[in-house]
């Protein structure tokens, strides 16, 4: 989940996280925190690396001291949730050892693929703050189409699952059609199997 428009008036990342958790449960966990809000929005704190990224292009730095305790608190909740995905990580965590960045990243990815954690990120698309981190998170933590169960088609009495394959018959879903005065009619679709030549 990407909480956008952090540079706008009335932007409140923590209220959004609280509402997400009350609606969908505690599995909606921040993996980033905003630095400031409204006109003072400056950047993002990455809870995996515990680094701050401010401005555009993002400059890596240390977490501001005023947000250090809050970042550590949110990171502790994230690490605890990630550790629960694997017995060896639970043992390491309960033994008081720090999880490495690789273990934390891999564990988060497995938890997201399993549906046990929904990562919550923040940023401002208009100011291009947090967007590169959003794209990195999509590549690092979200499942590829081959790792997900493919859509089921047909009625409930005769369901059929689709496996991703270029050799299979085409199955696609049109999700948007628009008209552009210069290009003409544009149709956006998601290909579930097959190929379009």
Language-model features: locations:
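Structural and coupling elements of P-loop NTPases
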Residues: 1-197
């Amino acid at each position: 989940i990407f909480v956008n428009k952090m540079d706008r008036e009335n932007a409140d990342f923590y209220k959004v996280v609280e509402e997400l958790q009350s609606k969908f449960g505690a599995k909606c966990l921040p993996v980033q925190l905003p630095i400031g809000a409204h006109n003072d929005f400056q950047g993002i704190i990455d809870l995996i690396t515990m680094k701050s990224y401010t401005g555009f292009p993002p400059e890596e730095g240390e977490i501001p001291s005023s947000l250090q305790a809050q970042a550590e608190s949110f990171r502790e909740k994230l690490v605890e949730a990630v550790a629960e995905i694997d017995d060896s990580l639970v043992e390491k965590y309960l033994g008081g050892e720090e999880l490495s960045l690789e273990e934390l990243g891999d564990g988060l990815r497995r938890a997201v693929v399993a549906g046990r954690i929904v990562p919550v990120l923040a940023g401002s698309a208009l100011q291009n703050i947090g967007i590169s981190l959003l794209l990195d998170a999509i590549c690092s933590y979200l499942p590829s189409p081959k790792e997900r169960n493919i859509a089921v088609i047909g009625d409930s009495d005769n369901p059929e699952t689709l496996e991703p394959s270029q050799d299979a018959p085409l199955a696609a879903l049109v999700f948007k059609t628009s008209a552009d005065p210069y290009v003409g009619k544009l149709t956006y679709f998601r290909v579930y199997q097959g190929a379009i030549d």
